[in-house]
Amino acid sequence: MSDIGFFARRYGPPPRQDRPATVLVHGLGLSGRYFVPLARRLAANGATVVVPDLPGNARSRAAARRAPDIAQLADALAGLHRRLSLGPSLVVANSVGCQVAAALAARHPHLVSRLVLVGPALEPRVSGRRQFGRLLADVPREPFRLLWLAASDYLVTGPLRCAASFHRSLRDAAASFEVNLARVRAPTLVVRGAGDTIASGRWTRRVAGLVADGRAEDIPGAAHAAHYSAPDAMAALIEKFTAGETG
């Protein structure tokens, strides 16, 4: 789909008012491609799944003349909801995409029925140098195919734009991330791969405590991109969460 102003993939049946869609939000500089395994599993169980490349990233690079900030990306997602008539949706985000999802839920609460934050980044009060070090430490913990996908996405998005997005995301993390999380009223599941070096266990538990109705889960054997390396476990957690089950 490209008639929404930027590129998005759709899996499963067309959206219906009586069945909330699922929107998957990628991390910094990436595309939605690393969400495809999870999208296919959710769609196989009847979900309508929309996976955009956010404006300025990958196949949507031309949709923004410069790197958008977090609030602009959240507003772009709100526009996607309206253009596709998605209504209140389950929003699943990874990494810096969690900042975008939190801003969406805070700025446009009527569009988010439930929220799943996978490896939320960037952690406030952690310097850019330390954040980058955490990213490097995570690299050997991820599947090789994911590293190839990420590298090719970064090249398409462009190193300079990735760097600009990183600095904008750092500023949002320091100024707005926790503020937005505290404004989230949708039930929220915070998921962390047990081997994630980017989103610490202490931070993910704090995220779950900041939102009005939050809970945290770990996925053993996974790292930062748990949705990619453990899509079956992630899909099971999401489906349990959307069914209203806890614990």
Residue ranges and their predicted role:
Residues 184, 190-192:
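Short beta-strand/loop motif that positions the catalytic acidic residue
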Residues 222-232:
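Catalytic histidine-centered segment of alpha/beta-hydrolase-like enzymes
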Residues 150-177:
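Hydrophobic, aromatic-rich cap/lid helix
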Residues 1-22, 44-47, 86-87, 156-157, ...:
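Alpha/beta-hydrolase fold catalytic core
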Residues 194-199:
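Acidic catalytic loop of the alpha/beta-hydrolase fold
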Residues 99-107, 111-142:
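Flexible "cap/lid" loop of the alpha/beta hydrolase fold
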Residues 11-59:
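Conserved HGGG/HGGXW glycine-rich cap/lid loop of the alpha/beta-hydrolase fold
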Residues 71-89:
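Conserved acidic catalytic loop of the alpha/beta-hydrolase fold
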